Amino acid sequence: METYDKAKAARVWQRVQNETAADPTQGLQGLIAEEWSDAALYLSLSKRVQGPQSAILKKMSQEEQSHLACLKGIYTLQGAGRPQIPTPPPADKTSVSMLLRRCYGREMRCLAQYEARASHPEYGQIFARMAQQEREHCRQLLELLGSLPPEK
């Protein structure tokens, strides 16, 4: 009796559906760097603002760290080895408002990449969940930008 070969079955389904499953590790190094940078920046920004804004940024940092861990896990499971983690970004003295604007653009880019990967047969649900959280981060960034006092 022959055992089920998952790799052979996947190749057959790809031919039947005339699709090729994208390599989930392709481009992950860039996403890993983005999530690492965002997690560090949100934590840094949480120390520069007060009250509920600080708590929101701390929570966003924790969620970005979770995304980072998931991406590293996918990278490792796919046999790509351990991903290279970039060195922490230097402290940025740019205004909070300007940094939040930059973060919004980066969150939108990550959102687009996660949504594009959401149809992956093995990791699609993970990418869809991270896309949903990135969408929420975009909303939170807009609220934070709208609630900041005018800069002097």
Give the ranges of each region predicted by the language model:
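Non-heme di-metal
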Residues: M1-K152
